[in-house]
């Protein structure tokens, strides 16, 4: 795990949990609060309030992170974590150092106003695996002006961006 937390109780709790579970991490402590998300359920449908100006908006490209990426078998990154310029540049730089045969999984997170087509395309060119849920799939279909079946749209992304795999997860209505 590569990220940033605040020098606060939540940040300490996160680092302690990673350590307890023997998860290798490069977590930088920064002078911003640890990020939180408030989730409200209205008739079973979640709405998110994603707090801004938090630690994970300030991830730095350390030499240790680049060294780790160069040896990685897999890297997972998302679009939400790239909402700030600093973290976007860091995540994209670190991801670019992964070996060509490593899995570079883009777990797209299309939340509120924290994405645009440019960010998605930049991330797709770094990825070789794309994971989306059914709601995100429909947003991507509209954003890229695509028609066709789920399979046809998935194949378009695979061909256009040179993906190894396109993973579409279904919500509870499709289980």
Predicted features and spans:
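Short beta-strand/turn micro-motifs composed of small residues
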Residues: 3-5, 108, 170
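Conserved N-terminal subdomain of the carbohydrate kinase-like
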Residues: 2-79, 97-100
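Hydrophobic faces of well-ordered beta-strands that scaffold small-molecule active sites
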Residues: 1, 104-106, 130
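A short acidic, amphipathic alpha-helical/loop segment
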Residues: 86-94, 118-122
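Active-site beta-loop-alpha junctions enriched in small/polar residues
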Residues: 53, 80, 109-111, 135, ...
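Conserved phosphate/ATP/ADP-binding segment of small-molecule kinases
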Residues: 101, 114-175
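Glycine/threonine-rich flexible loop motifs
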Residues: 49, 82-89, 140-144
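Active-site glycine- and acidic-residue-rich loops that bind
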Residues: 82-87, 110-116, 147-148
